[in-house]
Amino acid sequence: MASPGLGLLLALGLPLLPARWGRAWGQTLDPHVNENGTITPSAPGSGSNGALSQEAITAIIVVFSLLAAVLLAVGLVLLLRKLREKRQTQGTYRPSSEEQFNHAAEARAPQDSKETVRGCLPI
């Protein structure tokens, strides 16, 4: 079951992934290449200090917000389905269960009265 939120999540999240994957594996956008063809890492102070960029923070917020919205929508649908089912069975007439309930109520003596139920012998 595909949801519209999943399509939106993929549309917004997938363009950000390739750029982030390259940086995660130590690749930079402009590597320094020596005369002999070896790539030298950039200076320790020139790169980021391990903090996430603004785009990464925004992408994380968007992804988790969409995930929360999808979970909320699924929960709401399940709740409405349960309420609709309960409303459909609330007013139904079931004679067999009604009779069982009435016979059980007649057989029990009221808790607060001192009367005995007719037809029962005292113990």
Swiss-Prot record:
Q: Where on this protein are sugars attached?
A: 36
Which GO molecular function terms does the record list?
SH3 domain binding
Motif stretch (PDZ-binding): 119-123
Its record classes its membrane topology as: Single-pass type I membrane protein
Keyword S-adenosyl-L-methionine in the entry? The reply is no
Bilayer-spanning residue ranges: 60-80
Q: Which UniProt keywords apply?
A: Cell junction, Cell membrane, Glycoprotein, Membrane, Signal, Tight junction, Transmembrane, Transmembrane helix
Cytoplasmic-facing ranges: 81-120
Subcellular compartments: Apical cell membrane; Cell junction, Tight junction
Those parts of the protein on the Extracellular side are 27-59
Residue ranges under compositional bias (Basic and acidic residues)?
Answer: 96-117
Q: Name one GO biological process term.
A: protein localization to plasma membrane
Task: Give me the Gene Ontology terms describing cellular component.
Answer: apical plasma membrane; bicellular tight junction; subapical complex
* Record flagged with keyword Repeat: no
User: According to the UniProt entry, where is the signal peptide?
Assistant: 1-26
- Name the segments for region: Disordered: 87-123
Q: What is its main location?
A: membrane
What domain notes does the record hold?
The PDZ-binding motif is involved in the interactions with PARD6A and PALS1.
Task: Quote the function comment for this protein.
Answer: Involved in the establishment of cell polarity in mammalian epithelial cells. Regulates the morphogenesis of tight junctions. Involved in promoting phosphorylation and cytoplasmic retention of transcriptional coactivators YAP1 and WWTR1/TAZ which leads to suppression of TGFB1-dependent transcription of target genes such as CCN2/CTGF, SERPINE1/PAI1, SNAI1/SNAIL1 and SMAD7.
Q: How does it assemble?
A: Component of a complex composed of CRB3, PALS1 and PATJ. Interacts (via C-terminus) with PALS1 (via PDZ domain). Interacts with PARD6A. Interacts (via intracellular domain) with EPB41L5. Interacts with WDR83.
The protein in question is named: Protein crumbs homolog 3
Q: Which organism is it from?
A: Canis lupus familiaris (Dog)
Query: Mind giving the lineage of the organism this protein is from?
Result: Eukaryota, Metazoa, Chordata, Craniata, Vertebrata
Report the gene name: CRB3
